[in-house]
C-alpha cells in the first residue's frame, strides 16, 4: 500500500525527466493535482490531464524540456514527509534559490506557491521545492 502519493508523484516526474520521457503517469489525488497545477503555472511542466482507467484515476503529465533537450526541472525535492512534517509561518516563508525556485505550501486556503502564501498572509506545511 502506498502511503505518500506526493512523494511518489514527485519521484515519478523526476525519474521520467532523467530518462527524457515525454510523459509521466501519476496516481491521482487532489493534493497531487493542485501541486501539478502550480508546476504548470510556473512553467515546470507543459501540461497535465486526469484520466480514468476503470475505477482508478491517474494523472498524465507532459514534461517540459529546453531547446537542448535538458529538463526544465533541475531539482524536485519533497520537504515535509509523513515521518517529519515541516511547517512554516507566514513570516518564515522565504524566497527559494534567490527567486529562481518555487516552494509549494499546503495552507488552510489550499495548495499554493510560497509567494502566493506570503501575499495571502498564511503559512502551512511545506510540501516540496522545485527549481
UniProtKB/Swiss-Prot annotation:
One of its GO terms (biological process) is translation. Gene3D superfamilies: 3.30.1370.30, 3.30.1490.10. InterPro entries: Ribosomal_uS8 (IPR000630), Ribosomal_uS8_sf (IPR035987). Pfam families: Ribosomal_S8. Signal peptide: none annotated. The keyword Nucleotidyltransferase does not apply. Keywords: Ribonucleoprotein, Ribosomal protein, RNA-binding, rRNA-binding. The keyword Ubl conjugation does not apply. One of its GO terms (cellular component) is ribonucleoprotein complex. It comes from the Bacteria. One of its GO terms (molecular function) is structural constituent of ribosome. Part of the 30S ribosomal subunit. Contacts proteins S5 and S12. One of the primary rRNA binding proteins, it binds directly to 16S rRNA central domain where it helps coordinate assembly of the platform of the 30S subunit. Belongs to the universal ribosomal protein uS8 family. This is Small ribosomal subunit protein uS8. It comes from Campylobacter concisus (strain 13826).
